[in-house]
Regions:
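Short, positively charged
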Residues: 78-86, 166, 394-402
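Gly/Ser/Thr/Ala-enriched C-terminal appendages of enzymes
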Residues: 1-32, 36, 41, 45-47, ...
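Buried, small/hydrophobic-residue-enriched core segments of structured protein domains
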Residues: 1-34, 42-44, 80, 86-95, ...
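N-terminal, Lys/Arg-enriched amphipathic/low-complexity engagement segments
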Residues: 34-90, 99
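Residue-level "edge-of-site" marker
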Residues: 204, 294, 318
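Short coil/turn segments at secondary-structure boundaries
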Residues: 73-74, 142-146, 160, 454-461
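Hydrophobic residues within beta-strands of alpha/beta enzymes
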Residues: 199, 263, 291, 313-315
Length: 486
């Protein structure tokens, strides 16, 4: 493959999207209006919440949907597709509607993150790319959020580019990590493309290039006096690394009146080393010197280090963030929820499974989030039919759809719709926020979740309930074996 060739992301689809599309056209179903939902079934790492991310890339993709002459020639060469279908693809573009939760929104299992309303072939062909972006970026944003909360207000930087699973994994992973709370990245191109602050200082190779560790530290301080963070574990952290860093600071920075500087550990017993280093630095008068640590960290290890009293100001987190190593699959799915008949009536559809967790919620839906007026905290999410409204001036009884005897009456609450219009009739109607706005929004929304939902171990199951009307339709479809009545 020519590495300079620009790939057409329209072709980034599972092959069965095309075979189904050809079949829809063959049976004159290409214009049938369909409703698909993107949702996930469980939170990674047995957590209490996830963070939605990836919408900006989906918007760009939808706006650029098309098939090139080369694409058509390739498909013709497969000898599976009719000429009528290939002609259809020549003028292919998206004309449907899309609703989505804003990026940075905390989300929960089985509620729609995206709803697509479009003609059958269009809705089918976008499935793969929508899932790819939502699954990847939501996974990394969620992992970053957990790691940043474990750091208890300390700076977290994303350091994982070299361990990422491909270029997009590094570039978009850094973007998602920033949404989830990371302060910056080591990935330069993510700064160039998205404005994710890129930073870094030195590797062990810098130290090894000089005749001595002290010479390496002096040289770095001379070149970057206002950004001198020295890697102190190339040889012996406490016997040479920290003492040589202090000496370089004294010789180069102190005469310049610079007191802000840093050291970094990338190996060893981090809790022990940082406590010893902090005392050495303070005793030498470098109380403003910051200590950064890296070395295969994640939220569990960071929490453990802080429980042990580690003296750390910032964390560089690499492979276990950028690959979400502990649970590297988000598990989002794209399922048909309804179709329209020739008169425009919405016909609900359901997927039935022996596994109760895989039974889908039918129909064209919307999602509300309820906030307590007393505390400002999120109390529950509520999935209802698209034409149902919630009167938040009246008490509302909600129930667990899997255990309907579990009920709760909400009073004194405000209701907010989570799904917002993104495309109408194929035209973008959504004002894309900046990445900093998304990050700030994410932090604000996380602050509305109770600590019981946020905790790492055995978090509270946040309420995601169905309206009575939606639950009845679901049960009727289940009792009818999935077949819509009428």
């Amino acid at each position: 493959m020519d590495p300079n060739k620009t790939l057409n992301m329209t072709m980034l689809c599972d092959f069965y999207e095309l075979t189904m599309g050809n079949g829809y056209l063959d049976h004159d179903m290409q214009d049938r209006i369909t409703y698909f939902d993107v949702f996930f079934r469980s939170v990674p790492d047995d957590g209490g919440y996830a963070i939605a991310a990836g919408l900006e890339q989906i918007i760009d993709y939808i706006q650029n949907l098309h098939f090139t002459d080369e694409d058509i020639a390739y498909l013709r060469g497969r000898k599976l597709f009719s000429e009528a279908f290939l002609d259809y693809l020549k003028n292919f573009h998206f004309t449907g509607d899309i609703w989505a939760v804003p990026e940075g929104t905390p989300v929960f299992p089985r509620e729609p993150l995206i709803t697509v309303r479009a003609p059958a072939i269009q809705a089918q062909l976008v499935e793969t790319y929508l899932l790819l972006q939502i699954n990847h970026q939501s996974l990394i944003a969620t992992k970053a959020s957990r790691i940043c909360r474990a750091a208890q207000g300390r700076t977290v930087l994303e350091f994982g580019s070299r361990r990422a699973q491909g270029a997009d994994g590094a570039i978009l992973g850094a973007r998602a990590a920033y949404i989830g709370g990371c302060a910056g990245t080591a990935c330069t191109i993510s700064d160039e493309l998205f404005g994710v602050f890129a930073g870094g200082t030195m590797a062990h190779s810098w130290v090894q290039m000089f005749d001595s560790e002290l010479d390496a530290f002096r040289a770095y301080c001379q070149t970057y006096p206002t950004n001198a963070t020295l890697l102190v574990d190339t040889y012996n952290s406490l016997q040479s690394g920290v003492p040589n860093a202090i000496r370089a600071f004294n010789e180069v920075l102190k005469p310049l009146g610079i007191t802000r500087c840093g050291i970094r550990f990338d190996s060893g017993d981090i809790a022990y080393l940082t406590k010893k280093a902090r005392k050495m630095l303070d005793d030498a008068g470098w109380t403003d010197c910051k200590i950064t640590v890296s070395n295969a960290l994640d939220e569990r290890l960071i929490a453990g280090l802080l429980r042990q009293g580690a003296q750390v100001d910032s964390f560089g987190v690499g492979e276990r963030l950028i690959t979400a190593r502990s649970e590297p699959v988000f598990g989002g799915v794209y399922k048909l929820a309804a179709i329209e008949d020739e008169n425009g009536n919405i016909i609900p559809k359901i997927k039935i499974s022996e596994n109760v967790g895989k039974i889908t919620n039918p129909h064209f839906k919307k999602v509300y989030r309820f906030y307590s007026k007393d505390t400002g905290m999120a109390e529950a999410d509520y999935i209802c039919l698209h034409d149902e409204d919630v009167d938040d001036t009246q008490p509302l009884e909600i129930c667990d759809p899997d255990a309907t005897w579990k009920k709760k009456v909400l009073t004194n609450f405000t209701a907010r719709e989570l799904l917002v219009p993104v495309f109408r009739g194929g035209e973008l109607v959504y004002q894309k926020p900046s990445l900093d706005e998304i990050r700030t929004y994410c932090a604000g929304q996380l602050a509305t979740l109770w600590p019981e939902v946020l905790r790492f171990d055995y978090p509270h199951n946040y309420y995601v309930d169905l309206s009575d009307k939606l639950l009845k339709i679901k049960l009727d479809l289940l009792n009818a074996g999935g077949k819509s009545q009428g």
